[in-house]
């Protein structure tokens, strides 16, 4: 098994790379969700320069890189502990796959550990998430991260930094649980349906870096797409509560307002952008993470 340092570095590098590369999709999603009407094209045309697509990159990069490092490290600790307990009970060695050095667990264990790790880390990183969303939005004209933090603290207090944690947790915990479950399942299913000519093995009987990266990244993209679609309504509600806290105060009032005063389909607002971003982000982050931790064995 890779060291804890390896998981921290792998998670940080993967999260940072995906955050910087995909920030434009995140910004467009935030601005599209804050509007009651309009189209994605109108959102794009409202930008003054192409560089505005990367507004909020710093808080996004901090949140995603640190959050990814903490999440993947804590997830690994929990999954490894469960695997070692099973090893102790059965006197077997910890099982890993040909494309991965991560321990293999049951579907239920993958679901629970993924959800719990994400919920915990999500709470820790909630303040930077609030700053990121406000910074990306056109409803606030913050000139710096420091100004955003001071404004939130002065006007809303400490609670302002945790605004919308309920729907955020309802989005992220189920998403991560479903993601880990599907990801681990697909890593073992894909090799059985891919042409044998594409599956290259090294001298130790494991997949080569090219093959394992292709399998892991494809599994990540497919898993993220499915989990993102299921949890999309919570993302819309979370964004509304964080952008307009005086108008959208609770989960249920926000949901009711969107459905009755706008349109039920609006709870899936920004799904196409989030779907694209989450799928690509997972493919990049987990592909990098899986390969980096192999160097810390």
Swiss-Prot record:
It catalyses: glycine(in) = glycine(out). The keyword Transport applies. Keywords: Membrane, Mitochondrion, Mitochondrion inner membrane, Repeat, Transmembrane, Transmembrane helix, Transport. Its main location: mitochondrion. It comes from the Eukaryota. It is found in: Mitochondrion inner membrane. It is a multi-pass membrane protein. GO terms for biological process: glycine import into mitochondrion; heme biosynthetic process. The chain crosses the membrane at residues 8-33, 56-82, 111-136, 164-187, 215-241, 270-288. Belongs to the mitochondrial carrier (TC 2.A.29) family. SLC25A38 subfamily. Mitochondrial glycine transporter that imports glycine into the mitochondrial matrix. Plays an important role in providing glycine for the first enzymatic step in heme biosynthesis, the condensation of glycine with succinyl-CoA to produce 5-aminolevulinate (ALA) in the mitochondrial matrix. This is Mitochondrial glycine transporter. It comes from Candida glabrata (strain ATCC 2001 / BCRC 20586 / JCM 3761 / NBRC 0622 / NRRL Y-65 / CBS 138). The lineage of its organism: Eukaryota, Fungi, Dikarya, Ascomycota, Saccharomycotina.
């Amino acid at each position: 098994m890779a060291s804890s340092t390896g998981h921290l570095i792998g998670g940080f590098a993967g999260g940072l790379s995906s955050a910087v590369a995909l920030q434009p999709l995140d910004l467009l999603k935030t601005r599209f969700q804050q509007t009651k009407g309009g189209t994605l094209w109108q959102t794009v045309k409202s930008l003054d320069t192409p560089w505005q697509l990367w507004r909020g990159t710093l808080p996004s990069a901090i949140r995603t890189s640190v959050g990814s490092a903490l999440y993947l490290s804590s997830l690994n600790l929990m999954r490894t502990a469960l695997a070692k307990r099973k090893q102790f009970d059965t006197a077997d060695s910890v099982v890993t796959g040909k494309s991965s050095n991560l321990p293999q667990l049951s579907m239920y264990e993958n679901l629970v550990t993924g959800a719990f790790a994400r919920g915990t880390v999500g709470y820790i990183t909630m303040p930077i998430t609030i700053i990121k969303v406000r910074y990306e939005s056109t409803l606030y004209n913050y000139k710096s991260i420091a100004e955003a933090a001071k404004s939130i603290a002065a006007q809303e207090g400490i609670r302002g930094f945790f605004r919308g944690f309920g729907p955020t947790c309802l989005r992220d915990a189920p998403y991560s649980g479903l993601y880990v479950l599907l990801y681990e399942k697909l890593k073992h299913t894909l090799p059985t349906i891919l042409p044998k000519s594409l599956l290259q093995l090294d001298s130790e009987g494991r997949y080569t870096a090219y093959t394992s990266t292709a399998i892991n990244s494809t599994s990540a993209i497919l898993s993220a797409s499915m989990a993102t679609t299921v949890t999309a309504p919570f993302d819309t509600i979370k964004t509304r509560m964080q952008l307009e806290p005086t108008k959208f105060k609770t989960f249920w009032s926000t949901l009711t307002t969107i459905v009755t005063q706008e349109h039920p389909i609006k709870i899936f607002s920004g799904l196409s952008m989030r779907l694209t971003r989450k799928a690509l982000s997972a493919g990049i982050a987990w592909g990098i993470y899986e390969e980096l931790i192999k160097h810390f064995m």
